[in-house]
Design a protein with these regions (language model features):
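Large intracellular
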Residues: 3-5, 18-152, 225-280
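Helix-termination/interfacial motifs at the ends of transmembrane alpha-helices
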Residues: 7-10, 14-30, 140-222
């Protein structure tokens, strides 16, 4: 369970509701929840939510849009990617290979749940050329990362579209306010009409910053974690195939992990590592 995402979204909406409720009748107390009615407008909902949804549909393939529930499920039920655990498994394989040879890895590989890890081990068990193995695995990582990037970009585009349609709604409201203004009746309704016009901008900003941006950020973070683990697998498998010492392999991978943590080892387009295909 991704508690930080849930706490952030729920906490953000709660604070917004409290903020919108402050400043009512003093006799009621510090919070006047009847003021929430001031922030409700059906036309604004249609413009912002409808316009944003139309942008998502028009700009993305149907297969990707249909996986929206899956994307949300990934975020809420976030699987942890543990690079240290990956290193431990690689060292275990290195010890088996050093003691019994590469062919002895097949039995242990069949017990792996990660298809990418299993594929990587089986490629060296089958005696494939090391350069071809690296190229194949790196290509898999790049393709996975590209698909993940497309998914995250969909939500980033939605976060840009929501405030834009909020502004469209505001302009529509202002136009209607000016057209319907009664020259003889004065400007007594301008404040109310202006408030309604600004509600669409409010909806757009909330939708962008409390819904779409957090989703996109979580998906990108998850992609980075997956890609890091996959790259560790590639480096480890290559070291096993070349017959390197298990202790040296551990130090090498831990050094790679430390370099990545300091920002020096992130090479997304060259093939960052990960485990799984959740965002596809």
């Amino acid at each position: 369970m991704n508690l930080t995402f849930i706490l952030g979204i729920v906490g953000g909406f709660i604070l917004l509701v409290l903020g919108m409720s402050i400043g009512g009748e003093p006799t009621i107390g510090p919070f006047d929840f009847t003021q929430l009615a001031n922030f409700g407008d059906a036309a604004s909902i249609f413009i912002v939510f409808g316009g944003t949804l139309a942008t998502i549909i028009a700009g993305n393939p149907g297969k990707m849009i249909a996986k929206f529930p899956r994307h949300i499920g990934i975020i809420f039920n976030q699987k942890k990617f543990n690079p240290s655990s990956v290193i431990d498994e690689i060292v275990e394989f290195a010890q088996i290979a050093r003691k019994n040879g590469l062919l002895a890895l097949e039995e242990r590989a069949n017990q792996l749940e990660d298809p990418f890890f299993k594929k990587s081990i089986m490629l060296i068990v089958d005696g494939n050329d090391s350069d071809k193995v690296r190229d194949m695995l790196t290509s898999d990582i790049e393709q996975l990362s590209t698909r993940h990037d497309d998914v995250a970009s969909m939500y980033e585009k939605a976060s840009a579209a929501a405030p834009a349609f909020g502004m469209v709604g505001t302009l529509i409201g202002l136009i209607n306010m000016l057209v319907n203004m009664d020259p003889e009746g004065g400007s007594s309704n301008i404040g109310k009409d202006m408030g309604v016009a600004l509600i669409t901008t409010f909806y757009g900003v909330i939708l962008a910053n409390l819904v779409f941006n957090p989703i996109a950020n979580n998906l990108r973070t998850r992609d980075e974690e997956e890609c890091l683990c996959r790259q560790l697998i590639v480096e480890g498998v290559m070291a096993i195939q070349s017959g390197e010492n298990p202790k040296f392999i551990r130090e090498k991978l831990e050094g790679y992990l430390e370099q990545n943590a300091t920002g020096g080892g992130s090479e997304k387009k060259k093939g960052r590592g990960g485990r799984g295909k959740e965002q596809e």
